[in-house]
A protein has these predicted regions:
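C-terminal functional extensions of proteins
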Residues: 2-3, 17-104, 109-197
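Extended, H/D-rich, highly charged conserved domains that either
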Residues: 5-7
Length: 197
């Protein structure tokens, strides 16, 4: 996801395809060019700081201080400088975050989604001391991945069979609507006519 997201930020394409589904000239190599731009910067955070990566998931993670763990696979291109290529070290890094999770959205990476699901606690304790299932959503275009996650013991997972791009677009739309509604309700007109926040 990170490479495709960064390619979209830098070149406006994903695997060389534009948002309207058209192939771009030399598009088959754009993901490698994106990786190389980040490698030249030194890290994803530095690529954001230098204005190379200007929007997208990874940009938002860096700007808002959201931790992320990128682990490799045997067929990785690149990889990006932030990718942990040692499988055991990658699992350890993932475990440090999954134990603190209050919600998980697993998107379009079968092996990583299943591995993460296996590390997640089934239940979490809220601030008020109540116990609840950990909200877990698995998004993939393959029903196999969604089913496999539940079959491997992540019983609390809710599966969404769709492509990741559509899911992310819809998720963003609803999050933005929710934020707009909260902003609107936070602005109240005081009896004197003054606006308070």
């Amino acid at each position: 996801v990170a490479v495709h997201d960064i390619e979209a930020s830098i070149f406006g394409t994903t695997l060389g395809m534009t948002g309207s589904g058209e192939a771009s000239a030399g598009g088959h190599g754009l993901h490698m060019r994106a990786i190389n731009k980040v490698r030249a910067a030194g890290s994803i955070a530095k690529a954001v700081e230098q204005g190379i990566v200007t929007h997208g998931i990874m940009h938002a993670c860096v700007v808002h201080g959201v931790p992320f763990v990128l682990t490799g696979s045997i067929r990785d291109d690149g990889p990006l400088p932030d990718v942990i290529t040692d499988a055991v070290a990658g699992q350890d890094a993932m475990k440090r975050h999954t134990t603190k999770a209050t919600m998980a959205i697993l998107i379009a990476t079968a092996l990583h989604a299943i591995a993460t699901g296996n590390m997640l606690p089934a239940f979490v304790t809220d601030a008020d001391g109540s116990l609840r299932e950990l909200a877990t959503i698995c998004v993939d275009s393959s029903e196999f991945v969604v089913s496999k996650l539940k079959d491997r013991g992540t019983h609390q997972a809710f599966g969404v069979v769709t492509n990741a791009q559509d899911f992310m677009h819809i998720l963003r739309l609803y999050v933005e609507r929710e934020l707009d509604a909260r902003r609107s309700s936070a602005i109240a007109v005081a009896p004197s006519g003054a606006v308070s926040r």
